[in-house]
């Protein structure tokens, strides 16, 4: 099985039964990011970008699936550490050009407030946080 196909299958399984903040099927988010990427490495990392944070998958288990060290380094960079503030996380993402590109696309997708039918105050606060991060990464 090709690595991109394998990555999509893992992402679909990892995000099974998950919904985004707009109530949509979550897997659509990483798929949208994947479609914005240029190289296969970028596409694989984009579709897997939330798998380590949001499922039982780890960088080590993804390594056993045969993903390249480049993809794994991007995924590690895109995974927020337990004791890390959001701002520290964004500063770390800046150091990896591929992770930076994916995180910018992630933030842009997450800032599409029109997907939420009736945005609440918490949605607007989250949007402000994402916008600050987007500006820091641009």
Q: Where in the sequence are the language-model features?
A:
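Active-site helical microenvironments for divalent-metal-assisted chemistry
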Residues: 1-138
């Amino acid at each position: 099985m090709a690595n991109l196909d394998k990555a999509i299958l893992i992402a679909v399984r990892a995000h099974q039964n998950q919904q985004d903040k707009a109530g949509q099927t979550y897997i659509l988010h990483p798929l949208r990011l994947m479609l914005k990427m240029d190289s296969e490495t970028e596409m694989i990392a984009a579709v897997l970008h939330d798998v380590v944070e949001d499922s039982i998958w780890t960088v080590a288990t993804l390594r056993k699936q045969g993903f390249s060290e480049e993809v794994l380094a991007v995924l590690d960079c895109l995974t927020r550490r337990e004791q890390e503030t959001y701002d520290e996380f964004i500063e770390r993402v800046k150091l990896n050009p591929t992770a930076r590109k994916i995180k910018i696309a992630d933030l842009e997708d997450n800032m599409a407030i029109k997907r939420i039918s009736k945005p609440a105050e918490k949605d607007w606060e989250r949007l402000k946080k994402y916008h600050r991060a987007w500006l820091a990464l641009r």
